[in-house]
Structures are given as structure tokens and as C-alpha cells.
């Protein structure tokens, strides 16, 4: 099978190929379309609406309700391990549904961001610069498929381990289905739960990976922009007016970068904030399940779930730290350009521009948390607090004892 033919943007194009930064989100936006949150195409209007209803009803709306209803109606029938397996996913399912609704409301901003990437592309002329963008595009798409693989491995592992022991993966509540009554009901409920969870994982990939896809290609443009700033004033045959025009063009380039960031900021702020709220709790329940209750199959599924949860915030938080460093490099590059012997107008404009470049690009989670590695570590450490609390209160022993008595 020729993957290059079917997935060309997974591979780095030659430096002579035209630049298309928007290809960094090619597969992401195709999957966003399959989430059913786009305007239905005229040709497949009915099919798209039906698909959108089925996926979002099962994964976005009913699944969080099904978890809660299942706890209310059948809590006494859960073993401690089964309850924690279900609970860790329930919190993540509730957060996933919230993130999907945020992206659904703001999905047009992805198209606006891609239009701004097209503006940045028009400034790319050098073959070396084109190659740099091509590398960012291929890396971005490979990361998207890596996310998809990790999330889907979790959903499938949980499904298979549950079927092996003869129970539905999460024991959600479905009207008219009692999986204890017959093998047919068990198969139907397990299939429904797997469809809902696979759909939720598919949605989660899109709402978790889009910041990484967009910021990766932004960093490539910022690296090229830094070299453009460093070369200011070094062209010997330019007049003073031409040098000034080149500086003004760089200021315009920086404004496009800021518009790109401002375009994505509301979406990123909402989705990352939601994830920060639940990541510590979810990881804490997962640790308790792995250490105290899980059998081998459940432990493998829980470990893959933990990897998926860590992917939801960690890569983007790392990129945010790198993005801050990139901004400081822009200021250094401008200061290193040949400006000392230029005219007063050029120097004043450059100094004003330098002050703007020294203001780093940062993302905030609903103006509450700065999105950074430090914040990610802080919220992740909360999982150890949850684990320690459960250990000190001997909750695990009490749960195990109650299960033995039953």
C-alpha cells in the first residue's frame, strides 16, 4: 500500500513544491467535518444531518448522562475496579462533551486561521523557507495520526477486556437493555458503548490536537520571520526608503501573526480550561485503579487511557513554552539587524517595533491559568493528592471488603 499516495501531507514535500501551511490541519479539519459540527453540504445534506445526529446524540449528549444514570441505578453491582474504570472515563466524557460544544460554537475560527496562514505563505519565497514549512506540515499531520492511534487503542482495549470477562465496558444505562438478562442484550449494550466511546475518542482527538497542529506551523513561520528580521538593513543596494518599507512590511507580518493567535485564542482558552479542571482527578482515579484493583487486561486499558489523558494537555503546554522563547528570539533578531547607522525615522520605528516584539505570545485558560508546562505539572500533581487521600482513608480496603461480603 502506497501511503504517500493516499496521505501525501504525511511526508515532507520537496523545497520546490508550493507552500501550503493550511495542509498542517488537512486531516484534522476532515475529521472535524466528520464530527458533524460543520454546515451540512448540499449534496449530502440528509446523510450528513443523520450522521451528525447519531454521533453527537450517542457520544456528545447521551454518553455523559448514561454514565451518571448507570451509577444511580446499578451502583451496588459495580466491583471497585469496574467502578473506577467507569468513573475515570465518566469525568473525561463530561469534559469531552463540553470541549466539543466549544469547538462546535467556534469552528469557523479554524477557517479564519487557515486564511491567515495563507497570508503568511505569500511571504515565503526562499527554497529553504519552503522546506521548513513542509517539515512542519508533515510533522503536524503525523502527530494527529499518533493522537488518533493512542485514543483508539484505549477504546478498543477497554472493549476487548470487558468482553473477555463478560461485562459491558462501562455499564452505562440504556433503556430497554439489561445486559444481565441475555447474551444478545450484552452484545447490544457492549456494541453501543463501544460506538459511543469510539465516537467520543474520535471527537477528543480533534478537540485536543488542533492547538498542536496550528501552533506547530506557526512556530515554523516565526522561525522564518526571525531570519527575515535579522537580515533587515543588510541589503547593500537598497535605498533608505526601501529599507524603511522592508521594516514596515515586517511589522505587517507580525500583525498577521498576532491576528492568527487572537483568532484561535477563544477556542484554545475554553477547551484547555475544561481539561485542566479534570485532568488531575481523572489521573488520580486511574492510578488508584491500576495500583489497587485492576487485573492485567484492565491495567493495560487504564495505562493507554492515562497516555491519552496526558496527551490532552502536555504537548500543547510544551509548545506554549517554546512559543514564548520564539517571541524573545524575534526581539533578539531585530536587535541584531543592521539598524544603528540608519536614519532617525527608521530607528524610531524599529524601537517601537522592538517593544512590541518583547511582549511574548501567551495563551490563558479562561484568564485563570497560564497555559504552560508549569501549570500542566501543577494540575497533574493533583492526581497524586487524590491517590494519597484514598490510601490514607483506606477507601480501597473498605471497597474490597464490601465486595467480599457481597
From Swiss-Prot:
InterPro entries (alphabetical): 7tm6_olfct_rcpt (IPR004117)
Its membrane topology: Multi-pass membrane protein
Highest taxon in the source lineage: Eukaryota
Keywords, alphabetical: Cell membrane, Glycoprotein, Membrane, Olfaction, Receptor, Sensory transduction, Transducer, Transmembrane, Transmembrane helix
GO CC terms of this entry: cation channel complex; dendrite membrane; plasma membrane
Disulfide bridge positions per record: none
Glycosylation sites: 394
Pfam families for the chain: 7tm_6
Gene Ontology terms, MF aspect: ionotropic olfactory receptor activity; odorant binding; olfactory receptor activity
Principal location class: membrane
Topology, Cytoplasmic side: 1-44, 108-142, 203-271, 320-359
Residue intervals annotated with topology Extracellular: 66-86, 164-181, 293-298, 381-406
Location of this chain's protein in the cell: Cell membrane
Single Gene Ontology BP annotation: detection of chemical stimulus involved in sensory perception of smell
Transmembrane segments: 45-65, 87-107, 143-163, 182-202, 272-292, 299-319, 360-380
Family recorded in the similarity comment: Belongs to the insect chemoreceptor superfamily. Heteromeric odorant receptor channel (TC 1.A.69) family. Or2a subfamily.
Binding partners and assembly: Interacts with Orco. Complexes exist early in the endomembrane system in olfactory sensory neurons (OSNs), coupling these complexes to the conserved ciliary trafficking pathway.
Misc note: The atypical heteromeric and topological design of the odorant receptors appears to be an insect-specific solution for odor recognition, making the OR/Orco complex an attractive target for the development of highly selective insect repellents to disrupt olfactory-mediated host-seeking behaviors of insect disease vectors. Odor-evoked OR currents are independent of known G-protein-coupled second messenger pathways.
Biological role: Odorant receptor which mediates acceptance or avoidance behavior, depending on its substrates. The odorant receptor repertoire encodes a large collection of odor stimuli that vary widely in identity, intensity, and duration. May form a complex with Orco to form odorant-sensing units, providing sensitive and prolonged odorant signaling and calcium permeability. Involved in the behavioral responses to butanol, ethyl acetate, propyl acetate, and pentyl acetate. Also responds to pyrazines.
Protein's name in the database: Odorant receptor 42a
Organism of provenance: Drosophila melanogaster (Fruit fly)
Lineage of producing organism: Eukaryota, Metazoa, Ecdysozoa, Arthropoda, Hexapoda
Amino acid at each position: 500500500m502506497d501511503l504517500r499516495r493516499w496521505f501525501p501531507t504525511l511526508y515532507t514535500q520537496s523545497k520546490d513544491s508550493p507552500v501550503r501551511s493550511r495542509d498542517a490541519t488537512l486531516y484534522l479539519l476532515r475529521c472535524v467535518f466528520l464530527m458533524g459540527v460543520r454546515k451540512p453540504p448540499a449534496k449530502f445534506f440528509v446523510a450528513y444531518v443523520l450522521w451528525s445526529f447519531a454521533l453527537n446524540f450517542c457520544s456528545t449528549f447521551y454518553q455523559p448522562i448514561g454514565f451518571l444514570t448507570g451509577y444511580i441505578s446499578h451502583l451496588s453491582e459495580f466491583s471497585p475496579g469496574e467502578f473506577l474504570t467507569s468513573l475515570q472515563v465518566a469525568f473525561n466524557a463530561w469534559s469531552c462533551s463540553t470541549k466539543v460544544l466549544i469547538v462546535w460554537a467556534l469552528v469557523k475560527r479554524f477557517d479564519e486561521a487557515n486564511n491567515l496562514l495563507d497570508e503568511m505563505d505569500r511571504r515565503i519565497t526562499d527554497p529553504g523557507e519552503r522546506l521548513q514549512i513542509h517539515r512542519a506540515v508533515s510533522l503536524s499531520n503525523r502527530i494527529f495520526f499518533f493522537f488518533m492511534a493512542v485514543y483508539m487503542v484505549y477504546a478498543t482495549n477497554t472493549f476487548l477486556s470487558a468482553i473477555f470477562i463478560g461485562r459491558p465496558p462501562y455499564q452505562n444505562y440504556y433503556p430497554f437493555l439489561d445486559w444481565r438478562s441475555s447474551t444478545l442484550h450484552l452484545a447490544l449494550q457492549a456494541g453501543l458503548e463501544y460506538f459511543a466511546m469510539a465516537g467520543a475518542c474520535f471527537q477528543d482527538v480533534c478537540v485536543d490536537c488542533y492547538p498542536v497542529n496550528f501552533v506547530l506551523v506557526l512556530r515554523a513561520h516565526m522561525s522564518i520571520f526571525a531570519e527575515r528580521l535579522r537580515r533587515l538593513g543588510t541589503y547593500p543596494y537598497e535605498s533608505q526608503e526601501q529599507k524603511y518599507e522592508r521594516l514596515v512590511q515586517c511589522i505587517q507580518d507580525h500583525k498577521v501573526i498576532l491576528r492568527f493567535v487572537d483568532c484561535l485564542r477563544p477556542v484554545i482558552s475554553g477547551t484547555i480550561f475544561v481539561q485542566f479542571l479534570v485532568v488531575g482527578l481523572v489521573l488520580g482515579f486511574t492510578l488508584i485503579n491500576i495500583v489497587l484493583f485492576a487485573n492485567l487486561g484492565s491495567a493495560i486499558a487504564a495505562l493507554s487511557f492515562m497516555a491519552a489523558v496526558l496527551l490532552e494537555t502536555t504537548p500543547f503546554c510544551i509548545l506554549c513554552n517554546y512559543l514564548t522563547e520564539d517571541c524573545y528570539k524575534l526581539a533578539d533578531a531585530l536587535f541584531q539587524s543592521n539598524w544603528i547607522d540608519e536614519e532617525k525615522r527608521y530607528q524610531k520605528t524599529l524601537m517601537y517595533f522592538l517593544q512590541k516584539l518583547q511582549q511574548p505570545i501567551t495563551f490563558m485558560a479562561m484568564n485563570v491559568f497560564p497555559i504552560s508546562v508549569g501549570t500542566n505539572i501543577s494540575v497533574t500533581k493533583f492526581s497524586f493528592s487524590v491517590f494519597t487521600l484514598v490510601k490514607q482513608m483506606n477507601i480501597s480496603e473498605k471497597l474490597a471488603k464490601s465486595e467480599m461480603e457481597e
